[in-house]
From Swiss-Prot:
Gene3D superfamilies in the cross-refs: 3.30.70.330
Chief localisation class: nucleus
Alphabetical GO biological process terms: mRNA processing; RNA splicing
GO terms for MF: mRNA binding
Family assignment from sequence similarity: Belongs to the splicing factor SR family.
Region called Disordered, residue ranges: 106-140, 255-301
Transmembrane regions listed in the UniProt entry: none
UniProt feature, compositional bias: Basic and acidic residues: 110-140, 255-270
Keyword list, A-Z: mRNA processing, mRNA splicing, Nucleus, Repeat, RNA-binding
Signal peptide limits: none
A GO cellular component annotation in the UniProt record: nucleus
UniProt-recorded name of the protein: Probable splicing factor ECU05_1440
Length: 301
């Protein structure tokens, strides 16, 4: 059970690091690699307590902490990178092959060109064939070359034929989580708040969330409830409540498309404000129509 620590200042010693992280649990091993290093804990709970705290600083210097991914290079990776490199397209005139003098055998130069878009033997990525293969000329509205081919839309007298450059085909609604309408965002929470402490606070008020996590900026949390009634009651009861000396604010979770739509509307309203003479005057500042809406940029599942 290992975590990664980065941005370690030069004046911070190994003893200081072990003493600081010892408050979260027993540190079994410390391995420093200069400005970064790795810590081993005796239990998974210790790592969870470290990661729940949003900020860490040692001797006044902030450091970054995250879970170690644990990936390792294969033993034969160095050989392939230095000598063969066959997995990256074979021979290239732009690659330096002077290191091959120590290899068992030099690389073989060969042509590895992939089939082109109009190669008559292969179909393109959208299911069509090359013009030479089909025997017709290339057209932007060719149904076989359309990204979202539809028998109805290509024959519809109202819609007509849509080619691959049609904006209605290139832009789709974002796929958000189906339970976003059951989520509540609690803003203005105290820094370094553990998610378990805040979850216990919500449960003490009679609500049982099905999902909870801290926001990426560290000053808000996202809770998901089982139904709309619990969500509405939690927003009404906990809005203005005090937690660790901070007054909480609640709002509904904004999906990506809803956030973009409200931000666009807010920007248009702030840019064109009518003056006394009836003319539109650009404003220097932009005010969001929803307080705390900037935090929704990072709140996407």
């Amino acid at each position: 059970m290992q975590i990664f620590i980065g941005k370690i200042p030069n004046h911070v010693s190994e003893e200081q690091i072990k003493e600081y992280f010892g408050q979260f649990g027993e540190v079994t091993d410390v391995s420093l690699k200069g400005t970064y290093g790795f810590l081993n804990f005796d239990s998974e709970g210790s790592i969870t307590r470290v990661l729940n705290q949003r900020t860490h600083s040692i001797d006044g210097a902030p450091i970054s902490v995250e879970r170690a991914n644990g990936r390792k290079r294969p033993l034969d990776g160095e050989y392939h990178d230095r000598y063969m490199d066959m997995g990256r397209g074979g021979y290239s005139p732009h690659r330096d092959y002077r290191g091959f003098r120590n290899a068992p055998y030099p690389p073989m130069r060969y042509e590895s060109r992939s089939p082109g878009r109009y190669d008559p033997r292969f179909s393109d990525r959208y299911g069509g064939r090359s013009p030479e293969y089909r025997g017709d000329s290339f057209r932007m509205g060719d149904p076989q070359r359309s990204r979202d081919f539809c028998e109805y839309c290509n024959a519809c007298p109202i819609h007509g034929m849509r080619d691959m450059m049609d904006s209605r085909k290139r832009h789709h609604m974002s796929r958000d989580h189906p339970n976003n309408h059951l989520k509540v965002v609690f803003e203005n929470i105290a820094p370094n708040t553990a998610i378990e402490d805040f979850k216990n606070f919500v449960q003490d008020h009679g609500f049982e969330p099905s999902y909870a996590r801290l926001g990426y900026s560290g000053n808000h949390a996202v809770f998901e409830f089982k139904n709309i009634e619990d969500k509405d009651n939690a927003m009404k009861k906990l809005d203005g409540a005090e937690f660790n000396g901070h007054i909480l604010k609640t709002r509904s979770y904004l999906s990506k498309d809803e956030y973009k739509s409200r931000e666009r509307e807010s920007h248009m309203r702030s840019e064109l404000q009518p003056t006394d003479n009836g003319e539109a005057e650009p404003q220097g500042t932009t005010t969001d129509i929803y307080e705390g809406i900037e935090d929704a940029k990072a709140e996407n599942d």
